[in-house]
């Protein structure tokens, strides 16, 4: 349990009051996510993380991360409903028994052995990730449309095997989603995503479920970052960024699914293309004249009853007026062999090459894990895994400490969602 300061305690009391109100008899919805474990590396003490978005996350994570979601329908009458949703998140390095938000500090010494600085860190970070109300049935012509306001994860698109979010505009805001328009579904939202102390609002428009051919559909998206600077900030801000997204989803592809994504963006969103950003939290001071694009393909297939294979392929480029291009190409593959309903052997290999303003970098990772899960599906969780990973950096001889361009991780991890 986290030690509670006054603000944390007040928040907890508020949440509890909402969800246990005697005037509402519906059960509380309880969902969550957790990853945690223990591991060591060859040269760096505990297990290390190396470019996990580019080479894959299996056996390549060094944290304890959890999300706890509580939700409750507060009203349901005459086809109208109101639902309150909340989520708290906790992040730590998992190094101790009692990890809280109390700050721990250490004195730092210079080369002469004299104390000349202090470094302070929290054992754990606690965050409010979602707190919103979603209302359904308020639009008579669109009874399935959802009107919402508050802070929320907003229609996030990611690749699980690398934890790469390529379209994620989450934040505080408001909108209407799932409007039936033509043959598809329209969603409109505005979300606040400040850049430091500069106010930025992301206008998000999506049109989904556009039928293409059998078992295939298209989603289109437009994001516009409106920089709302003060008079004093006008000299330091750049141009408003925009991002266009097209995602084709195909079901029943060799027993699985496949997604192909095309994205084009300008200004600070353009910078995020090769930077593997998600189209949120733009840098309002970013240099003008940036264009970026990326092409992504990812999916999971089941070629036989005993094998499932996940993959991602990403190519991205960002062009600047003031410097040379930033480009990246990466591939991650995760094959899984199922021994029975609960035991599997999982492999993951990843490789990337990158050039950023004429600076080259590249690396790879290979992991083998023996795992036990609640079911045989690629997506079955909870999953307990024992893993060994080999990491290699091809450009930096000191990537893992002085004179070390390779490293290994050995560890045990659990991953669960519910």
From Swiss-Prot:
Keywords: Cell outer membrane, Ion transport, Membrane, Porin, Signal, Sugar transport, Transmembrane, Transmembrane beta strand, Transport. PANTHER family: CRYPTIC OUTER MEMBRANE PORIN BGLH-RELATED. NCBIfam families: PRK09360.1. Belongs to the porin LamB (TC 1.B.3) family. One of its GO terms (molecular function) is maltodextrin transmembrane transporter activity. The keyword Ion transport applies. It catalyses: beta-maltose(in) = beta-maltose(out). It is found in: Cell outer membrane. It is a multi-pass membrane protein. The record marks 165 as: Important in sugar transport. This is Maltoporin. Homotrimer formed of three 18-stranded antiparallel beta-barrels, containing three independent channels. Gene3D superfamilies: Porin, LamB type (2.40.170.10). Involved in the transport of maltose and maltodextrins. SUPFAM superfamilies: Porins. HAMAP family: LamB. The gene is lamB. It holds the Pfam family LamB. GO terms for biological process: monoatomic ion transport. Residues 1-26 form the signal peptide. Transmembrane segments: none annotated. Induction: By maltose. The record marks 33, 65, 379, 417 as: Greasy slide, important in sugar transport. The keyword Amino-acid biosynthesis does not apply. GO terms for cellular component: cell outer membrane; pore complex.
